Amino acid sequence: SVVADTVNVTDSPNCKSRLNSLLVASEIRRSGLDVILQLTGRDRNQIALESVLLGALSVGVNKVLCLSGDQPDKNGPVVVNEFTSNGLIKLCKVISRGTLTDGTKIKNPLPIFPGAADDLYDQLSKPESLSKLATKIEQGANFVQTQYCFEFDIIKEYSDKLSDEGSSNDCKVLVGMGPLKSAKQGDWMRKNLWGINISDDILYQLETSDNPIETGEKICKELIEKIIHLPCVDGVHLMGPNCEIGSARIISNFR
């Protein structure tokens, strides 16, 4: 049975070739589950991006997380980068209004709901980050998904900052987190993935646990219980590579 409200389909993360994200999103949508299609400007020019968005609408996928995309190493594949994440949000809005960028009219246009990514730690340490998020919201972002965060104090400070600025009034904010399976996994993530800060205390809980998988799920569940009533926190974006069953168990606690 369906547990999550929607699921994200990633777009060649870490700049590695993966199964076409729109194909996967289409199959999931056909099963009856709602989908958020992640779309990067890294690999596609304007024509290719418009084609993906039209294709998404044709199969009932109308939520798009607009990303710049992980960039390759110096000797990696050639990138396009014609569109930034901001540019992708604007493109979604143009298509929602019924035209392509060259003015071509779209028959029976449908709305696209673009989303933006955010990093809580950047928001709290770099004054310019809030204005960048505000710009994305002004350009039409309907929702925000943040990077992983496992610290209540950081999430509360982020929530208070958004509330004070009023910058998220017109969109939904989903805080990112996920069940960690081991201290080793958590340590690797904080060293290698953008925007992630996992405290030594959490790693210690996992390392000393007789059942680290259960402990990782418990950490998530308890954090969700603390943040669901914060202002400007509208939901949770659970990320659990190879932890889909654990993520489902966490969600089930709140149904």
Identify the function of each model-found stretch.
Residues 1, 21, 46-53, 124-135, ...:
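Short, acidic/polar
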Residues 2, 59, 139, 230-231:
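Structural motif
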Residues 6-17, 39-40, 65-66, 142-151, ...:
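Catalytic beta/alpha-barrel core
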Residues 7, 56, 136, 140, ...:
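Conserved, mostly hydrophobic/aromatic
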Residues 15-27, 45-52, 70-104, 125-128, ...:
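Active-site-adjacent beta->alpha loops and helix N-cap segments on the catalytic face
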Residues 54-66:
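Hydrophobic or amphipathic alpha-helical targeting/insertion segments
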Residues 81-109, 117-122, 165-223, 242, ...:
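Active-site pocket-lining/capping segments in soluble small-molecule metabolic enzymes
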Residues 129-181:
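Aromatic-anchored, glycine/proline-accented short structural segments
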